[in-house]
Structures are given as structure tokens and as C-alpha cells.
């Protein structure tokens, strides 16, 4: 596996552990609907949370969350709708982004952006 894939996978595991430490229940990881993928599907009390994980080794050119563009949002929302329908879930849901930034010290800075975006109309 390429080094950047290892970094991304490690970041997703760290994000899962972070969510668990906050009391979330992890329902799915890397859930796919066709070519669309949701990194983490979790439950926060009675809310289904669809989480996009973005990690970077630096933020010189852009912040990790800047990689979640409109096309990515559309794909996440479509996959989330498929998940909710296929699992017959009618509870509230939201879309979060967790960013991990590798600091020069080797530590990670984790940021959790709740309700990072809403589903665009017509999707």
C-alpha cells in the first residue's frame, strides 16, 4: 500500500477512536454505494452522523476541510440517502468533517466540524 494510503487509513482509525471517546457508536466504516464512499457512519445519541475524514501533513496551501468541495458533498449526500433508505432509518442525521493535521512534533491536531454542511436541494 502506498505511504499516503497508510497515512489516510491511520487518520481514519484515529477519527474513529476520537468519536468513540466522545461516546459515539461507530456503525460503519468505508461504507460504499457504487463509487461513492462514506468514511465513517456513527450514531451520536439518536442522530446518524455521516463523517468525512480529511488529513494532511501540512496546511501550507489549504486546510484539510477545503478538499470537501461541492462534488464531494453531492456524493456524500447521495450515499447517505442510499444508506438511510437501505437500512430503513428515519432518524435525524447530520454531516460532519473531522480533520487531522500532522504537526511538526509528530502529534496530530484533530478538529471536529459538526454540521459541516447541509444536503443541497435537489439531491
Predicted feature descriptions by range:
Residues 1-29:
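Acidic-basic catalytic patches of nuclease active cores, encompassing PD-(D/E)XK
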Residues 33-36, 106:
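Short acidic/glycine-enriched loop/turn segments that link adjacent beta-strands
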